[in-house]
Curated annotation (Swiss-Prot):
This is Glucose-1-phosphate adenylyltransferase. Belongs to the bacterial/plant glucose-1-phosphate adenylyltransferase family. Its EC number is 2.7.7.27. Pathway: Glycan biosynthesis; glycogen biosynthesis. InterPro entries: ADP-Glc_PPase, ADP_Glu_pyroP_CS, GlgC_bac, GlmU/GlgC-like_hexapep, NTP_transferase_dom, Nucleotide-diphossugar_trans, Trimer_LpxA-like_sf. Homotetramer. Involved in the biosynthesis of ADP-glucose, a building block required for the elongation reactions to produce glycogen. Catalyzes the reaction between ATP and alpha-D-glucose 1-phosphate (G1P) to produce pyrophosphate and ADP-Glc. The lineage of its organism: Bacteria, Pseudomonadati, Pseudomonadota, Alphaproteobacteria, Hyphomicrobiales.
Length: 420
């Protein structure tokens, strides 16, 4: 380190990732897994983005709190995030809800998911806690947020971004002054307030918070003792600090990581089937808004050992081909054609099948002579020969989960019911 250059604050921080939510708006896609464990981008899980941001920012102490159907998530974390070494002052802890405070008490809210593990946090003695939601897709340098937190002497610093006012009721909405001190904070209001001078925009919380550890622990004890609290950061902790302390907003534009191919700040909630489908399909664009090829800010994940993707057959109507598509390792495209499609590991697509605008999760098998358009196919689903989806909205809605925008979610139980 050169003389006069301060050491990164991330060295003294611990990232605490909240990854216990179901994500019920993803419908059957989260029947078997928590939302942070949902697949994204061909190889990754959604949680890999928050974890990779922490790692790339220089944070070497990470904890992940899990609750809802956590097996898939825990297995992924054990396989893909097992490279932290205590001898280098690194740690990676998985913290399932385990009735640590009371025999009849699981995590009661996001704040309680931290409160029940205060002893683990204290054992590492970090100076700062970077509290993260494990279910968003974005690239962000948390070091810059830590710097603002210290420079402004905040009790809490809240990551924020502008969204359309029509969408803001799904988030915590804030109002800030000229120095970005938060003057009001409303969690998921029915009528979100607009930003000054921007009647169609609202400033919303990203679910990312920076605290001094000592202050956070004091607030968690205070909140835990309040019988009227729902023990949630957005509903209880943050509004209290806004009224009684100093809460500062950190604008995502200041710390968003962009490669040379990215010209906008990319952040997605992917909380609905339509949003999930669109965010994955966007990656098939010639220049996608999210650059997964950025070697300076890699998205770390578990890399399953697979052979290369394989394309076979070269006859008219039976040509193994893919255009504007992402095809992961272990896939075999046997006489099928793909357009604007994303295949995860180990997918097989058989002869005379045409697939367009599809997100197909690992080890699904697509039969012969199928036509699939605008679909999400869950992992390990077996699509029977000749199935047509995406051409008859009424029939699709009877057989599968069809979204408002016409995306069809296909799971194995839905396929099994076709024969009954």
């Amino acid at each position: 380190m050169s003389q006069g250059v301060p050491a990164p604050l991330a060295r003294h921080a611990m990232a605490y990732v909240l990854a216990g939510g179901r994500g019920s708006r993803l419908m059957e896609l989260t029947d078997r897994r928590a939302k942070p464990a949902v697949y994204f981008g061909g190889k990754s899980r959604i949680i890999d983005f928050a974890l990779s941001n922490a790692l790339n920012s220089g944070i070497r102490r990470i904890a992940v709190a899990t609750q809802y159907k956590a097996h898939s998530l825990i297995r992924h974390l054990q396989r893909g995030w097992n490279f932290f070494r205590p001898e280098r002052n690194e740690s990676f802890d998985i913290l399932p809800a385990s009735q640590r405070v009371s025999d009849d008490m699981w995590y009661r809210g996001t704040a309680d998911a931290v409160y029940q593990n205060i002893d683990i946090i204290e054992s590492y003695d970090p100076k700062f806690i970077v509290l993260l939601a494990g279910d968003h897709v974005y690239k962000m340098d948390y070091e810059k947020m830590l710097q603002q937190h210290v420079e402004q002497g905040a009790d809490v610093t809240v990551g924020c971004l502008e969204v359309a006012r029509s969408e803001a009721s799904a988030f915590g909405v804030m109002d800030v002054d000229a120095k970005d001190v938060i003057r009001s904070f409303l969690e998921k209001p029915a009528d979100p307030p607009a930003m000054p001078g921007k009647p169609d925009k609202s400033l919303v919380s990203m679910g990312i918070y920076v605290f001094d550890t000592k202050f956070l622990i004091e607030e968690l004890h205070r909140d835990a003792a309040n019988p009227d609290s729902s023990h949630d950061f957005g509903k209880d902790i943050i509004p209290y600090i806004v009224k009684h302390g100093k809460a500062v907003a950190h604008h995502f534009d200041k710390s968003c990581r962009r490669s040379h191919a990215e010209d906008t700040s990319y952040w997605r909630d992917v909380g609905t089937v339509d949003a999930y489908w669109a965010a994955n399909i966007d990656l098939t664009d010639i220049v996608p808004q999210l650059d997964l090829y950025d070697r300076e800010w890699p998205i770390w994940t578990y890399g399953e050992i697979t052979p290369p993707a394989k394309f076979v057959h070269d006859k008219d109507g039976r040509r193994g081909e893919a255009v504007s598509s992402l095809v992961s390792g272990g896939c075999i495209i046997s006489g099928a054609s793909l357009r604007h499609t994303l295949l995860f590991t180990g997918v097989r697509a058989h002869s005379y099948t045409h697939i367009e605008g599809a997100v197909i999760l690992p080890y699904a098998d697509i039969g012969r002579s199928c036509r699939l358009t605008n679909v999400v196919v869950d992992a390990e689903v077996r699509i029977p020969d000749g199935l047509v989806v995406g051409e008859d909205p009424e029939l699709d809605a009877k057989r599968f989960r069809r979204s408002e925008n016409g995306t069809c979610l296909i799971t194995q139980p839905m396929i099994d019911r076709l024969g009954t």
